[in-house]
Design a protein with these regions (language model features):
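Conserved acidic segment of CheY-like receiver
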Residues: 1-7, 12-36, 47-49
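Death-fold homotypic interaction modules
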Residues: 71, 140-199
Length: 815
């Protein structure tokens, strides 16, 4: 605004301010949530006042790239306190027009003959003597400066063709506007000015230099504007929890919430990952892989509260009723009606099966994560919306009911949480996967942890570990055979290192969602509509590209890739060894940043789908992140500080982590006249003892020479896992004349990791560790035979293992 009359600018400025604020409140409703709304309000246009010609030119030069428009008087001084120049305003307009032919100008004057100059420079004219000057000013500013709705006009008659209220409407109408009208607006920068006034600076700045002079093709312009808007909306949607609005949720939306309560543990974790991927550009660097989270809508905890109260469910829920009774009551209850339309909108956008996951307040909390206590249901996508709605609401009620099932109540007690503090949010998410006939499943699912307590070879504890499987992730949670590897050493995989192990210890079955089961009999088992299939079925579906290898029984060899005949072995060889898909690299990034931003070790669930075409591309979806907190895993003590006279066993090369203090027994192989030729008999004897421990529900420490579980009886005692399954710590002790390289328990590796068993290697005669056999020999034996001795103590022997430093000790009883 250029004006030197105090009376005039005292009336113009408040008038403009009122107008601008009202506008910015209107367009801030487009923002996705409260945070973005505030940012939008702050991005409103600013009003600057100049009182002289020099000041005006100075301001124009400084801000000329961001000016929405200029309002000027005609008579005002050239310099401060100078003489008034009768045509200063006209000269200003001429100077500005030279620089920018399109910026809107408004001339206001009390001398009506200046109207002629106004038309010469394409400016609007306002008569200061008019009674309705304020109203005129508002109208002209609104029409010319890009405020209000965007109106497409016919350039010849200036009548309205179309009206656009927000970005989504503009995106939808772009290709429908007639070419001449479109041309009229882009050649005058109207689109970018409208975006500026609505505080959408990135798009506006991108579009401003693209004028008719620089690109003379209407359709190319439409395309550029469309793509810019789509990119902007995607950028704005990623890493943000938007408020769910029916008219705004479309395929560019990523994460929205219904309700105002908490998102719960998993919901927060998802929002956290989404934000993390957005802030680290490295995730964008893969040509054939996209990293994302599935489309998600969260029903916040206040929906749960409302559901429980309006249906009077607390009484049944908190009683000691059977689980299925509770479930029946919940299924009869009604969800709030306003959700129906929201769900329909969601179905239209997602068009794939949905997973309904629990996200409770206490789940994945930093100190006592609750994992796997509540139910997760999956439902197929149906064309019949109402049928799908019925399944969805049943699933939501099923998840709500599972808060009050027996197991959850017991778990609550065990972790000293109060059940009425537990509230449940529900996550609705597209299921990651491809459809194969009546089945639906991803190419791979997995769980990655940023700590590895069983590092073998040159792996390091902090490099983390990944368990990978074909099909839905429930297979992993249920303890199926998965492929385990370190993301930094994807070429070294123990399970596929020897053919015999590869055939025995790789995945043979997988889970898929049954698309035919419409869930009429909703049950407490959330896996009721999953199929457990043999890997052969996936081969028929053509889902094993890049994932399987083929066993050739004639040459006794496993070949990477799919070949006719021969059993298919799930090795993920092409992905891990030949890097067809950058899975290992993505996992390195995810674990690195996840741990960095949570400031503690994390566990991440993910799934990936490979495209059906042969172009080797795929999408990697992050499903969940939770901090790793195990009471076992809080070991802060320095084990090297404990003196040798207090320990029974000490190993400087141990696997496993944690503290155990409920072991009272040690079984050890006597070393006095030991000879490897008796190993087979020793194995049978251990099996008998182990059975007694299993029957009594007790555990023990097992010590013996050489490699446990070796199939070569000269290298060690040939036990199988079931024969020693009650042992919590297994020790390989070398003898002077019988020294064996540590096998690190490779024969039972899967079992060691899943049961958290410690594995020590000690060569005491070489000063590598401590093994106080004299102390054991001095104790009375419960059972003694030619080769074995079993000692029981009144007080427990405490086991402490530090997985990061590979140290382990067993203390003397009572220490």
């Amino acid at each position: 605004v250029v004006e030197d009359g105090i009376r005039f600018y005292s009336s113009i400025l408040p008038n403009l301010y009122k107008f601008v604020l009202k506008q910015s409140q209107e367009f801030s409703t487009e923002a996705l949530n409260a945070h973005q709304r505030t940012l939008r309000m702050r991005g409103r246009p600013k009003i600057v006042l100049a009182r002289t010609y020099e000041e005006a030119i100075g301001i124009y030069e400084k801000y000329k790239n961001n000016i929405l428009g200029v309002i000027t008087d005609v008579r005002f001084p050239r310099v401060e306190r100078g003489e008034k120049d009768g045509l200063a305003g006209i000269k200003l307009c001429a100077a500005i027009r030279k620089e920018d032919p399109f910026v809107p100008l408004i001339i206001q004057s009390s001398e009506s003959e200046n109207a002629l100059y106004a038309s010469k420079y394409g400016a609007a004219f306002i008569d200061k003597n008019s009674k309705k000057m304020d109203v005129d000013l508002r109208r002209i500013v609104s029409d010319n400066f890009g405020f209000g709705d965007f109106i497409f006009r016919n350039p010849d008659t200036l009548e309205e063709i179309a009206r656009v209220k927000n970005l989504k409407e503009l995106q939808n109408i772009l290709f429908a506007v007639p070419a001449e009208s479109f041309l009229y607006h882009i050649s005058r920068n109207h689109v970018s000015r409208w975006l500026y006034s609505r505080a959408m600076f990135p798009v506006a700045e991108f579009l401003k230099p693209i004028t008719w002079n620089s690109l003379q093709d209407v359709d190319a312009h439409r395309k550029i504007i469309f793509e810019a808007i789509v990119k902007y909306r995607k950028m704005k949607n990623q890493g943000v929890v938007a408020v769910f609005k029916r008219d705004r949720f479309d395929r560019y939306s990523n994460f929205a919430r219904i309700g105002d309560g908490s998102l719960g543990g998993k919901g927060r974790g998802l929002a956290f990952i989404d934000n993390m991927v957005k802030h680290h550009p490295e995730f964008e660097e893969f040509d054939n892989a996209r990293v994302a989270i599935p489309k998600t809508v969260v029903l916040c905890t206040d929906v749960f509260d409302e559901f429980m109260e309006t249906n009077n469910l607390y009484q049944v829920a908190l009683s000691d009723a059977e689980d299925d009774v509770i479930l029946r009551y919940f299924l009869k209850a009604k969800l709030p009606d306003r959700l129906v339309e929201d769900f329909f909108t969601f179905f239209d956008v997602v068009k794939s099966p949905l997973a309904i996951r629990s996200s409770s307040l206490l789940e994945d909390s930093h100190y006592q994560p609750f994992a796997g206590i509540y139910n997760t249901y999956m439902i197929p996508y149906l064309d019949d919306k109402y049928e799908m709605l019925r399944m969805l609401s049943d699933a939501i009620k099923g998840v709500y009911a599972s808060v009050y099932f027996r197991d959850s109540k017991a778990y609550m007690q065990a972790t000293s949480n109060v059940i009425d503090q537990e509230k449940m949010a529900v996550i609705l998410q597209e299921v990651v996967g491809n459809q194969y006939g009546d089945r639906y499943y991803p190419s791979m699912s997995g769980v990655a942890r940023s700590l590895n307590y069983y590092p073998i070879g040159d792996e390091k504890a902090e490099e983390g570990t990944v368990n990978l499987a074909l099909g839905l992730g429930k297979y992993i949670v249920d303890g199926g055979m998965t492929l385990r590897f370190s993301p930094y050493h994807p070429h070294q995989i123990l399970q596929t290192s020897e053919m015999e192990i590869a055939l025995k210890e790789t995945q043979t079955r997988f889970y898929a969602l049954d698309l035919r089961n419409a869930g009429h009999d909703f049950s407490m088992d959330d896996g009721f509509n999953l199929l457990k299939l043999h890997v052969k079925e996936a081969e028929k579906d053509g889902a094993l590209n890049y994932i399987a290898s083929t066993y050739d029984p004639y040459d006794q060899i496993i070949r990477d890739g799919l070949y006719p005949g021969g059993r298919k072995v799930i090795t993920f060889a092409n992905i891990l060894q030949h890097d067809v898909f950058p899975l290992a690299r993505i996992l390195q990034l995810v674990l690195k940043y996840g741990e960095q931003e949570m400031r503690r070790p994390v566990e991440i669930e993910f799934a990936a789908t490979m495209s059906r075409e042969q172009d080797k591309s795929g999408t990697f979806y992050l499903l969940q992140i939770r901090p790793i907190v195990d009471t076992k895993e809080m070991l802060d003590e320095d084990l090297t500080a404990i003196p040798d006279d207090k320990v029974l066993l000490r190993s400087n090369n141990s696997l496993g982590h944690g503290i155990m203090n409920d072991i009272y027994d040690v079984i050890y192989v006597k070393t006095d006249d030991y000879s490897a030729s008796h190993n087979q008999e020793i194995a049978w004897e251990i099996e008998k003892l182990n059975q007694q421990f299993l029957d009594e529900g007790r555990n023990y420490v097992l010590v013996g020479p050489g490699r446990w579980g070796s199939s070569d009886t000269w290298l060690g005692i040939p036990v199988k896992w079931p024969h020693i399954s009650a042992a919590r710590v297994i020790v390989e002790a070398g003898l002077t004349n019988y020294r064996v390289d540590p096998s690190q328990g490779t024969h039972f590796f899967q079992n060691l990791t899943s049961f958290g068993v410690g594995y020590f290697t000690i060569n005491a005669f070489m000063n590598d560790g401590v093994y106080d056999q004299d102390f054991l020999n001095a104790q009375p034996a419960v059972h003694e035979s030619k080769y074995l001795r079993h000692v029981h103590f009144e007080q427990p022997v405490t086991v402490k293992m530090d997985g990061k430093k590979k140290l382990g000790i067993v203390l003397l009883p009572g220490e």
